[in-house]
Amino acid sequence: MRIARTFAALAFGLLAAVLSPAPAVAQTQQPQTQLRVAVTTAAENAPFFSAVERGMFSKLGLDVKVEMMPSGVEIVNALASGTVDAGLFGTYPFLTAVSRGVPVVLIGHTWNNALMNPQSEVLSVIARAEAGVPAGDLTKLKGKKIGVTRGAGGEPYIAGLLTQVGLTMDDVTLVNTAPSSMATALANKDADVIAAWEPWPSAALTKVPGSYKVIYGGCKSCYDAGTLVTTRAAIADKAKALELFVLGYAQGQAWARANREEAAKISTRWIPGMDAETLTLALKSLPLDVRLSKNTLDGFRTYSIPLLVSQKRIPQAFDPAASVDNRFVAAAMKADPSAFADLKEIPAGQRL
């Protein structure tokens, strides 16, 4: 009977405990440092989800509490209110927050190629069937309804693409669309095309019959590397924990780069309604590189900030250098060089 087996097991355990010699010194488990981290449901966060599930943070003594949020706009608000210690989101919400005096600090990248400037390879424009926008022909966006998440990376991305072909935002109709609703907007013809970050372009391609890619990346005036952001207050209170967090995140990135299909499967447990096929497609060529470089600052100054000014999302240009702190990535590179071994070395002249 189950009761008898359970009793016998308990009795055996008690007997073993009585007969076992007591340890010379009682072992106590070291308390873990709690870190509250907000992330979006973006494919670029696969390394983070992998690091959480594979225990990379806990092995470093961190108790990471995860907050899922729709976009960087909500994460910035959470950082500003002090309800989270760190956040993973896009360049444009980060720079907008800095321009408004929010005390946020960039301490690493999520999706990124430290050797590239400009870069927009996490973003794509996807069209529905019969949208009238041939692949590669951005001029045909004129007069179309474009689904974007207002205030997030897709909006300045589409603005940059339009500028490249002599169009402006006045030539199109922007439809404010939540990331998870992008495919639905195409299917219901609420939008002719969508401009979004992965995995939402891949989700549209796999879920909406007849949908196709108009352009992948391709913005010549965009610098939109994913950002790992904290606050000045968190740095003052939890600098060591943040150092360990960046180390664990870098290790998660290294694992995800080597195991993209498995990282995609892990991400399905964190991104509602997303399947492994879609996430595998989204992660296939996504650059994952936590390192900061001079390309970060140059990209912000040359492309990201001027674009935000031109779109009247920030009042004026500013120098972002004071809001970029490389010490945490530098510490991670020193602590575990193997987590960076598969990445191309940053040229000496481009290092921070």
Where are these regions (language model features)?
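Positively charged n-region of N-terminal signal peptides that target proteins for export
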Residues: M1-R5
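Bacterial N-terminal signal peptides
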Residues: A8-S20
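Short, glycine-/small- and polar/acidic-enriched structural segments
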Residues: Q27-T168, T173-N176, D192, E198, ...
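Catalytic cores of transferase enzymes with a strong primary signal for eukaryotic protein kinases
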Residues: I107-M116, L123, R128, P134, ...
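Secondary-structure end/capping motifs
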Residues: A236-A317
